[in-house]
């Protein structure tokens, strides 16, 4: 039996444009930041906005203030979830513990990697499922960007590998469930999923009425692996669900704080809610209800909504409408998760020489269920798949690895997904950007490097998606900005190369992630499309100028035509009235008028048809 030393992390990546000037302007209105800034700039140079990330500024106090979420926890009444960190500043509640700070590989102070741990209170019921939340931040002043990830570590009990496959199965199932029901990880989307959930007269959310949660429970009852015991089933279909979304709401809040600080967006300050209530520490359902209700209370405390708006809140969906109403321009830049599995075998091996680790069936099961979950119906089609997860163990036992074809197929898949091989580590990645690291010693630095590499690659993709949205808007509304879009995309390619250099220890993994996401091809296609649209816009401008020239020429031509007609008419000043009655003059004027009208109608028809076809092709391209 293989000794189990498995760790599992869910990653949620974000990318934020950094506005240094705006950051300091907002900092002036924050008590926590104004003191730090005044102390730092006391004897600094005149150009205060030229330096943002000087080493003296990147201190624990600044980052704790930057990521402080005690207001959110206290305001929703759930401050007992996390283990507090004792700080020299007692007036600031904090849960962050800095575990790593180092300059990037290029040695410049303007780019630094910061890592913080947020430990879940072991006495709290959430600790039954999750152990800690790690926050990764990379501030890059040169490229005016902030990238990072939230890494959620599962609490996995020490057991044999076969029994732990259920945790991996549940992770795949919740990931698939969220992917099919959440367009993106954000407050708005979570609130929408809890729509139609009733709020009683006491202001409490009745989660029993939640169709979204009921959908999860129905899936779990059909798919939950290994156990039909009612107690175990309740833990997964209710307690786990509530705990998972409590953490997601917290992650969304932290991301909102960073967005508010770093971007020119309409964000409000998260102030402490005066309505603090205490409740039992073993009720995840109440945690989730409190956090959802805190959104409504927070808007009321900050006077962002009227009393009339509050009185109309009868369902969670109504809270979502308020959020959309007052945060309509809020960008959402939190990606769906990747999962990192880290496994330490019971015996140290030299992976350069052989693959003895995969001689056991347990090791093969570990590889298949993490890297090829589709074999067990755990991929994106898991919900519609007829395979019941209780049959995983039996299904796996039926696989005959003594069959040369089966074994060769397994070896081929293993080599295809292999990214990195050293004497101490085997690193695999599948097309979902899930990573399996089999390592003799689980050093934290190795885990950090993997997370950073995935973070950098996904941050580039997030930025590319942003540019594609901006391009579509400009293509329709203001094509004159297409050239600036092209410059932004080209800068993104240089930023991608910069991040590859920052991931030098795992550059192969970085390249593999980009390959799976087809990032380079996406950028090339977008550049070609921008060039094509810009060329069309250039030709369109030429046609407009040509049309204006033709119209101008026609106007002058008409004037000259009438001048010419007037000269050939038999009209004199003395006999004007008699001349107008002359039928010859009437015929000449009539013929001239018909010719002019025909010319004008022809020109207008041609121009209108060309404009119509241009707009039609643009809309249906």
Swiss-Prot record:
Q: How does it sit in the membrane?
A: Multi-pass membrane protein
The record's annotation in NCBIfam families points to: MPN337, MPN338
Record GO cellular component, one term: plasma membrane
The record's InterPro entries line, in alphabetical order, gives: MPN337 (IPR054979)
Q: Which organism is it from?
A: Mycoplasma pneumoniae (strain ATCC 29342 / M129 / Subtype 1) (Mycoplasmoides pneumoniae)
Name the UniProt key words of this record, in alphabetical order.
Cell membrane, Membrane, Transmembrane, Transmembrane helix
Q: What is this protein called?
A: Uncharacterized protein MG241 homolog
From which lineage does this chain's organism come? Answer: Bacteria, Bacillati, Mycoplasmatota, Mycoplasmoidales, Mycoplasmoidaceae
Where is it located?
A: Cell membrane
- Transmembrane ranges, per UniProt, are 240-260, 548-568, 587-607
Domain of life per record: Bacteria
